[in-house]
Amino acid sequence: MGALVNSEQRQDVQESVNKLIAAGCEVLLGGEADLSAAGAFFPPTLLYCSQPDETPAVHAIEAFGPVATLMPYRDRQHALTLARAGGGSLAGTLVTASGELAREFILGAARAHGRIQILNEASSAESTGHGSPLPQLVHGGPGRAGGGEELGGLRSVKHYMQRTAVQGSPTMLATIGQQWVRGAQVNEDRIHPFRKYFEEIQPGDSLLTPRRTLTEADIVNFACLSGDHFYAHMDKIAAAESIFGERVVHGYFLISAAAGLFVDAGVRPVIANYGMENLRFIEPVKPGDTIQVRLTCKRKTVKHQRSADEKAPAWWNGRWRFSISTSRRWRCIPF
C-alpha cells in the first residue's frame, strides 16, 4: 500500500488499470492516481470483471501495484481454470478451512504458480502475507511470471554456482572429495579408529570386528530389559505364521550388540555418539545367526567452539558408516 518505486512505475500502473477498465472491468475502489501529487503513490484499487472467460485482458495485463480484480466462478473446476489462465504466477493464495479443497487446488494449480499459500484460521494470525519472500521457500514463478528463483530464498544461491559431475572409481572419488564412499578401498591397521586423534584418523580408516552368534536367550534378555515383547520376537507360534517364518532378533538389540563389537573401551579421543542417519533394517536376523560389523570413517570436520575460552578443548566431528552383516552374507543393517 506504500509508494511505488518511482513516478514512471505509477504511470505504468495507471495505464494498466485504464486498459483493464477499457476491456470491461468495473471500478469498485480507487482506479485513478493523482499524477500531480508528490510521491509515487497509487490508491488501493479493486476492480470487478463479470465475464472472466470472455475477457482475456484480465488475465494478460498485470497492474504491478496495489490493484486486484474480483472474478466470479461457477464451481471448483472453473476456479482452477481461472487460476491457471494467467499463464504463470509468482504466488497465489487460497483461503479455505477444507483440507480436501486445498489438496485439489494445489494439485490443479501448482504448475502455474511459484508458491501457493493456504490461509485458514490456524495460520492467519502468523501469515507472512501474499508472496512475501521467505528464505525457505521458492521465490519465483513459471511462465509469464518470468522465473526469478535466482532472486530470493536459499535456492537462489545455487543459481550462481556451477554444478560439475565427477566420474571415476569409488576410491578416486573418495580421494577427490575427502569423503569415503561405498565401494572405495578401506585402510585397516592394528590401531582401533577410536584411538586415533583428529590429525591421525583419515576417511577410509576401517575396522572389521570379531563375530558374535545371537541366541534365543539374547532375545529374551533384551525383551525383559527393554519391555519390548513384540510377538515377532517373543511368540514362537505367531512368529512362525508371519512373513519371517520364525522369531527374529530385535533390531535395536542388533544395534546395541554391534556397538559392543566395535566400541573400544577406555578413555579415547572419541567421546560420544549423537545420532544415526539412514538406519535401515533390510533383512531379518534370527536366533543362531552370526553377525559381524564393519566400521568405516566417512569424513571428519572441525567442530566450531561454543566457548570463547582459549582453554576450552577442541572438538571434531567424525561421520562413520556402520554395516552389520550375518553369516548368510546379507547386509542386514546399514547406517
From Swiss-Prot:
It comes from the Bacteria. GO terms for molecular function: oxidoreductase activity, acting on the aldehyde or oxo group of donors, NAD or NADP as acceptor. Residues 140-151 have a biased composition (Gly residues). Residues 123-152 are annotated as: Disordered. Pfam families: Aldedh, MaoC_dehydratas. InterPro entries: Ald_DH/histidinol_DH (IPR016161), Ald_DH_C (IPR016163), Aldehyde_DH_dom (IPR015590), HotDog_dom_sf (IPR029069), MaoC-like_dom (IPR002539). Transmembrane segments: none annotated. Residues 203-306 form the MaoC-like domain. Gene3D superfamilies: Aldehyde Dehydrogenase, Chain A, domain 2, Hotdog Thioesterase. Belongs to the aldehyde dehydrogenase family. This is Protein MaoC. It comes from Klebsiella aerogenes.
